[in-house]
Structures are given as structure tokens and as C-alpha cells.
């Protein structure tokens, strides 16, 4: 199971935004891949080299899109640049009897801040967002936001905010939940303890094993494999750097263009 959440806080907004044309779908997909990779690269730069990074570019893009809906002028242009001209409104993520994919959006507004009704209506209509006005000085509001996040990630993420600042006027959140079986399942009995070569040290960890045919590629010395989930719509792409190299050394070579080529 995979859960993710992203929150954005806003000091002011103006709800005037024109959605870009959706005719160039291929370019749109390429831009989305580029955004995801750049988002990961920027985030990775903020942590220590021996720390793990787990994030959801989709959640970040949805939260930023909700902000972009209320932007204009130079701010709108900056959102366009970051998101590649794409807006991530509510969409069918393909849940069925086999897999579960849920995305939920919410907008929390300070009772000291007024917001245009048409901006709220747009988020409710296009993003299926839950919208509420709250007292940001009340600690119960933080608890309510965390409870909402927990509810929409099946309890996997129960805490997203510690506190709210008196200067905060809005909180926008996207919560994402994913649970699906592998198309080619791993045999639990085949799991064995093996050595994982980390950046700091080698460590013995349980490793799954599966012998089957998968999509495979090599690029800049890295090995890539795609592990599809049942149904074929979603997959996990695993990148193994050359021996002795860490993620920081290979990230410059992982681009949207390189990803499409593979």
C-alpha cells in the first residue's frame, strides 16, 4: 500500500485562471514526467545524503494546481512554468475490484479571511474538493485536518500538520491512497536475507525474489526494470545505480527524455 499527501499554505489569492488547451496530450505527459523528476531532484537536495526520500509528485501537482486556479499575472506564469502548463484536476484513477486508487482534495479557509465564492465553487466542481471555514487559532483545527488526512489514506498518514501560523489563511491538501497486487506476484516463501549495499554501509535485509519476464533497460550504467501492477495501468520502475554510486550521482542523467526513451 502506498499513501501520500501534500499540503500548500496560501497568504492571498485571486481566482482568475484559464486552463490551457488539452490537445497536445503527448507533450502534456512528457511535461508531467519532467515535473515529477524535477520535484524529486529538488526534494532530494534538501535531505542528508544518507536519508531516504518518499514523496508523491502527483499530490504535489494537485495541490499546486488548486493554487494555480486562483492565480493571475506573474504568479500565474510561475505556476505555468512549474507545472508545464498542466492542471491536475479530479480524474478517474482507475479503481476497480482488483486495485484501489483514491485521491481526495480539501480546502481549509481561515475565518479571518474572505475568499471569492467562484473560486470555492471551481475547486468543488473541478477538484471534488471538501471546503470548510475554520478558526486557525484553535488547535482543534489542526487535529481535524490530520484526521481528514488519516481518513483519506486508510490511516496510513495520520499526521501532516503540527500547527498553523496566525498568518496562514488557507490550507490546500491532496491525499493519495494506492493499494494493488503485483501482476506477477512474489512468493513470500522465496524471500531471503541478503546484503543491501547502502550509501553509508552494507546491511542485511529481507529481499523478495521472482523469476519472470519484465521490461528491462540499461542507461548511463544504470539498470531499470518495470514491475507492473495487476491491470497494467500502473507499474513500479526500479532504478539500480552502478556499483559504488549513489542516487545523487545518477540523478542528473535521469530526465523526462531519458525516461521516455527507455
Language-model region placement:
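Detector for small/aliphatic-rich hydrophobic stretches
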Residues: 1-136
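Short amphipathic beta-strand starts and helix->beta connectors
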Residues: 45-50, 220-222, 258-261
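Non-catalytic, conformational "gating/processing" segments within enzyme and secreted inhibitor domains
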Residues: 50, 89-244
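Compositionally biased, intrinsically disordered low-complexity regions
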Residues: 72, 200, 223, 246-248, ...
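Mature, solvent-exposed C-terminal subdomains and processed small-chain segments of exported/organellar
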Residues: 183, 242-262
